């Protein structure tokens, strides 16, 4: 059986960011673009919440900001089809999830296979899901951290791109651990996007190789 191989494009790319809240990772990516570190432009900032602070930030920065209320749609599939239409209209190369609190449907995942990136505040495959910083504390983990990965049909199970570890301190709370992990998120997410548009990411099966 031939193994599927994907190599990211070496080009000036077009990014769509999906967010549900403040979008601090969106800001980190955009600031890396403005500094010249990432060879891309953010062509769409999308949210499922019209009041999301990240949308306001996008508008203040002169970026194309769009929101769609999920309620009028019959189901998740129809909602994601509407999002995909917005993405197609802008000829997007990479979708970045930045605190987007809705699960991407399998149809969306398949259409943009190896072109949807996410960041997770734990060292995957340990602690998928929500409230993972508290889980790391409760389980007595000595280290936690964050992971960038491509989005697959199974939640938090896509190919891992980069990881950064932080120690879990004995007096850590969910808030203090989250804050230290967030600092690392703001480093490895822009770095992952940079590598993508330098044509340096190769995916073979479920493994990522940096070229």
Tell where the protein language model's regions lie, with residue ranges.
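Short beta->alpha connector loops at strand-helix junctions that form conserved
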Residues: 66-71, 119
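N-terminal Rossmann-like dinucleotide-binding module
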Residues: 2-53
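Short, structured coil segments at secondary-structure junctions
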Residues: 61-62, 112
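Conserved acidic residues
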Residues: 43, 93, 114
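Donor/substrate-binding cores of folate-linked one-carbon enzymes
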Residues: 32, 98-207
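N-terminal glycine-rich "phosphate-gripper" loop used for MgATP/nucleotide binding
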Residues: 47-48, 71-72, 76-77, 90-106
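Residue-level detector of anion-binding/catalytic polar loops
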Residues: 64, 93, 142
């Amino acid at each position: 059986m031939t193994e599927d191989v994907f190599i990211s494009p070496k080009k000036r790319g077009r990014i769509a960011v999906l967010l549900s809240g403040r979008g601090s990772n969106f800001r980190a990516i955009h600031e890396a673009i403005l500094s010249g570190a990432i060879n891309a432009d953010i062509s769409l900032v999308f949210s499922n919440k019209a009041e999301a602070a990240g949308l306001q930030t996008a508008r203040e920065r002169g970026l194309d900001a769009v929101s769609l209320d999920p309620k009028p749609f019959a189901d998740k599939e129809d909602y994601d089809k509407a999002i995909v239409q917005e993405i197609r209209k802008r000829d997007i190369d990479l979708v970045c999830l930045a605190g987007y609190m809705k699960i991407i449907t399998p149809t969306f995942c398949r259409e943009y296979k190896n072109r949807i990136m996410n960041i997770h505040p734990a060292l995957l495959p340990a602690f998928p899901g929500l409230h993972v910083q508290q889980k790391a504390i409760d389980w007595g983990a000595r280290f936690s951290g964050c992971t960038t990965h491509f989005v697959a049909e199974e939640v938090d199970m896509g190919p891992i791109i980069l990881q950064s570890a932080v120690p879990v301190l004995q007096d850590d709370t969910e808030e203090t651990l989250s804050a230290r992990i967030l600092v690392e998120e703001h480093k490895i997410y822009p770095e992952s996007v940079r590598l993508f548009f330098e044509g340096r990411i190769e995916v073979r099966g479920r493994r990522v190789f940096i070229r």
